[in-house]
Amino acid sequence: MSGLQVLLVAGTHGNEINGPWLLDQWSQTPELINTHGVGVVPVIGNPEALALGRRYLDCDLNRSFRLDLLRSPSILDREVVRAKQLLSFFGPEGSTPCQIVIDLHSTTSAMGSTLVVYGRRSVDLALAALIQARLGLPIYLHDGDDDQQGFLVERWPCGLVIEIGPVPQGLLKARIIEQTRLAVQACLEALSSVASGSPTYPDEFVVHSHLGSLDLPRDALGQPAACVHPSLQGRDWQPLQMGAPLFLWPDGEVFRFEGRDSPIPVFINEAAYVEKHIAMSLTCREVCPLPEQWQGALQQLVDC
């Protein structure tokens, strides 16, 4: 086994408590998660926010890893300071350097168990493809959105997000915890297979590429004027057809989808995205080949 160190982060958002609870239970019962010999460094991303049950204190930690924020000595938001600390401790050049990061999240949307990859780095996609081949998890490929930047996993050589839902904020739910545990274990098992030189990569894998986001209709004061239509709520991953109901006004009027390409909505009515003016994101399904160069890039990173 190589000297690979994997940073396992939970509680990046302080009101997502299932991941932190799993890490706490794991510390008391090590056999809860089989690491398959991979070195794992568990850490709570935003412990102050977790203690208060809040998503964040000053700003979203998972948008605080932009280079301009990290390089500015004058920005003292607690999440930006925490982002710098995490990199100082666990970044590639940190005191306890980690090459790969797995960031655990939960969502109020009906996303099931999902892998989220930011950008199109070959090592991220190779790892996600390995995990998808083991568990069949969908991959949400989020790139090309200038309004959403500064994600934690982008600052490590390789990283992905495990997103599990639906679960209300601040609520422990056994099914969510078990899904998180299984996904973490699959990640570590996949990395162990790479480290031992025995990975079984698929010839191709499926991603859902980010197209953009839709907001709720809003009034002149910027307040929501309609809500997500009840027939759409909970239907993440189901293609939108022409004329499908999107939003419902208080008087019963329905706003319908007018596109023709049957995009696939994700993170429908996510509670945390209200402040970001996102009612849902739209994706398109892509079947991607898995080049040998990507596999080699992940192998090289793991062997370092």
Curated annotation (Swiss-Prot):
GO cellular component: cytosol
Cofactor: record remark: Binds 1 zinc ion per subunit.
Cofactor(s) for this UniProt protein: Zn(2+)
SUPFAM superfamilies linked to this entry: Zn-dependent exopeptidases
Pfam family, one: AstE_AspA_cat
Coiled-coil intervals, chain numbering: none
Keyword Nucleus among record annotations: no
Molecular-function annotations in GO: aspartoacylase activity; hydrolase activity, acting on ester bonds; zinc ion binding
Catalytically driven reaction(s): an N-acyl-L-aspartate + H2O = a carboxylate + L-aspartate
Keyword terms of this UniProt record: Hydrolase, Metal-binding, Zinc
Family: Belongs to the AspA/AstE family. Aspartoacylase subfamily.
PANTHER family referenced in this protein's UniProt entry, alphabetically: ASPARTOACYLASE, SUCCINYLGLUTAMATE DESUCCINYLASE
Protein name, entry field: Probable aspartoacylase
